[in-house]
Amino acid sequence: MYVATLVFITFVTLAEARVFNIKGEHMGSNDVTPFATYILSNYKKTVLYIGVTNDLNRRILEHKSKIDPNSFTAKYNVDRLVYFEKFQSVNDAIAREKQLKHWNREWKERLINEKNPEWKDLFDYA
C-alpha cells in the first residue's frame, strides 16, 4: 500500500513540477531539446552529482522523492538542481556528462558559479 501511494503522489507531483532556466524562465514540455546533462548538489554544497536524462523534470523529481533510499543521491541528500545544459542529441548529452565527470571540483564549481552564483535550486514545484 505504501509503495502504491508513493507512486501516486510522485505521479501527481510530477504533473505540477517545473524546471526553470537561470533567467527564471519555465523549461516546458514543448522544449525541442529533450536531453539534458545536469548537476545536483546538497544543501551544504559539499557533494556534487552529475547525470544525464531525456526528461529533466521527471529525473529531478525522482532524485527529490528519494524513491530508492540506497541511491547515492538519497544517501547524501543530493537533491538541488544547480546547473543543467540541454542537447538535441543523446550522444552529445552523454559526452558532456563524461567530460564534466572528469573535471576537478574547482572547475565544476566555476561552471555552476558562472550561471547560478547563488546555487539556487532550479527545480520548482508549481
Kindly label every feature range from the protein language model.
Residues 90:
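C2H2-type zinc-finger recognition helix
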Residues 1-68, 74-84, 94-98, 115-117, ...:
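GIY-YIG nuclease catalytic motif and its immediate N-terminal context
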